């Protein structure tokens, strides 16, 4: 299976002056923990890392540390643009691709394998977890105007897996129609293309804020203790 790792983000919401994937958590970089899970999966045979040129040296050194090989792909100004560029960097024979946020360092290796299996069966798939909080829609002036049915709500995660050619077609349509999406499942949704949910662990968080870093540190440290 081909895997694209999104690593072109910044550390703005983290309050850091560097890419959050380079920050230390439980003694290692965020990205190193993610790569450790990739390495322990059974399905990943090719890795592309989509990042900013300014981070290339640091990120490549983490791959060396983890004894993994990857193709470097320069990312864009948004996640959407970075995925487009990542698709251009895939090998010509790539039929399926998993896309994973490099900041989801708590991902379990088996999740890559389960997504890969569904994808090989012809099913577009995303990892997700049921929402446990009650979700409110709020007006601009702060008043509640709708409560959603929690039973129908899932929090989207990664990996997300798609047929390569179909995903390329989707991104072309997005460019033509000037659509902006925050993940590729949203793009498929706009086009009416089915995507299946694969339930994953609530621990598969995206490390985005200082609080996330504390949670990740505690969970990764506890895994080591076990």
Swiss-Prot record:
Catalytic activities: 2-C-methyl-D-erythritol 4-phosphate + CTP + H(+) = 4-CDP-2-C-methyl-D-erythritol + diphosphate
Class of this enzyme: transferase
Task: Please verify whether the record's keywords include Electron transport.
Answer: no
Q: Domain of life here?
A: Bacteria
**Pfam (any one):** IspD
This enzyme's EC code(s): 2.7.7.60
Q: Name the family.
A: Belongs to the IspD/TarI cytidylyltransferase family. IspD subfamily.
Q: What is this protein called?
A: 2-C-methyl-D-erythritol 4-phosphate cytidylyltransferase
Q: Which organism is it from?
A: Prochlorococcus marinus (strain SARG / CCMP1375 / SS120)
Gene, per the UniProt record: ispD
């Amino acid at each position: 299976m081909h895997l694209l790792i999104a690593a072109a983000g910044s550390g703005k919401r983290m309050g850091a002056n560097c890419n959050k994937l380079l920050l230390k958590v439980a003694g290692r970089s965020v990205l190193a923990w993610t790569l450790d899970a990739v390495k322990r999966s059974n399905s990943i045979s090719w890795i592309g890392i989509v990042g900013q040129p300014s981070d290339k040296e640091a990120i490549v050194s983490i791959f060396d540390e983890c004894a993994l090989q990857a193709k470097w792909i320069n990312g864009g100004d948004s996640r959407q643009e970075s995925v487009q560029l990542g698709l251009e960097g895939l090998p010509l024979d790539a039929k399926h691709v998993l896309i994973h946020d490099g900041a989801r360092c708590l991902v379990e290796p088996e999740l890559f394998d389960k997504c890969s299996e569904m994808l090989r069966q012809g099913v577009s798939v995303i990892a997700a977890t049921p929402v446990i909080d009650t979700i409110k829609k709020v007006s601009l002036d702060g008043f509640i105007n709708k409560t959603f049915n929690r039973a129908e709500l899932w929090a989207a995660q990664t990996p997300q897996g798609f047929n390569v050619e179909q995903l390329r077609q989707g991104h072309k349509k997005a460019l033509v129609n000037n659509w902006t999406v925050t993940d590729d499942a949203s793009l498929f949704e706009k086009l009416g293309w089915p995507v299946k949910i694969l339930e994953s662990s609530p621990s598969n968080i995206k490390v985005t804020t200082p609080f996330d870093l504390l949670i990740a540190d505690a969970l990764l440290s506890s895994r080591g203790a076990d």
